[in-house]
Amino acid sequence: MQNNNILVVGGAGYIGSHTCLQLAAKGYQPVVYDNLSNGHEEFVKWGVLEKGDIRDRQRLDEVLARHKPRAILHFAAMIEVGESVKDPAAFYDNNVIGTLTLLSAALAAGIDAFVFSSTCATYGLPDSVPMDESHKQAPINPYGRTKWICEQALKDYGLYKGLRSVILRYFNAAGADFEGRIGEWHEPETHAIPLAIDAALGRREGFKVFGTDYDTRDGTCVRDYIHVLDLADAHVRAVDYLLEGGESVALNLGTGTGTTVKELLDAIEKVAKRPFNIGYAERREGDSTTLVANNDKARQVLGWEPQYDLAAITESAWNWHSRRNQGG
């Protein structure tokens, strides 16, 4: 009988762990490969943990030989845009060299199904909104460029090596498992929803809004927040698609609905049932006015349909963060 092992690289992290939950629910056997630099061992609840770095070819070969996965899901990456500007070398080393090492190991092991976590940051500043997959890719920071380079490698490996891949370009991942088993946990935290919830919980002095003079309905930036379980569902569908013989494709993952920063803060205040201190500052360099996905292609190719709205995102995030003790 064919095994149902799926290697989830970076599976101890935020999106990876939620995808393991969904894979297990659909009858797959997740095998987590993670160096735990950003992941959490306690998030590995739906399969074994193989500790290792994506730049360690020997370790990758061992794990692939042991588990013989049918497909690889690759989440492992450094993701903080500000850090990528301060230390681009670390991002190129981890994100690009790490991905190329993983791809070489996959090809050597005869694995031709690969799902890659990419980002709307590969598009850069939007020419039009909502953005579809034909939008030009002109990333504006090292983080976005490392992901774009990996996308080019995947296309070439597909053309010349027979590797089939689904590239998933996320918009703003948010929310948590509704049972509170896993959730968003970054150190340091830079994402808007956890920061605002921490402000509401009194764990930080307040929340800072960068820019109130954007050309939007209330002057603050618009973003497309997508529930992490909707992202996870798309990854499982991408595995199904590849294992059924699907061809390489790049897909946006967003809801197609934009939320302003002020609307997001109102939603968090509603679920927190308390006001919190909000400060205002100048715009941050590189922040786009509006980033919203056109997700028609993902719906068409994967039969995927986002299930959760902003209320579900903020409620599940509040549930997770309010239960968690500060600092873990």
Curated annotation (Swiss-Prot):
The keyword GTP-binding does not apply. Its cofactor is NAD(+). Keywords: Carbohydrate metabolism, Exopolysaccharide synthesis, Galactose metabolism, Isomerase, NAD, Plasmid. One of its GO terms (molecular function) is UDP-glucose 4-epimerase activity. GO terms for biological process: galactose catabolic process via UDP-galactose, Leloir pathway; polysaccharide biosynthetic process. Coiled coil: none annotated. Pathway: Carbohydrate metabolism; galactose metabolism; Glycan metabolism; exopolysaccharide biosynthesis. This is UDP-glucose 4-epimerase. It comes from Rhizobium meliloti (strain 1021) (Ensifer meliloti). The gene is exoB.
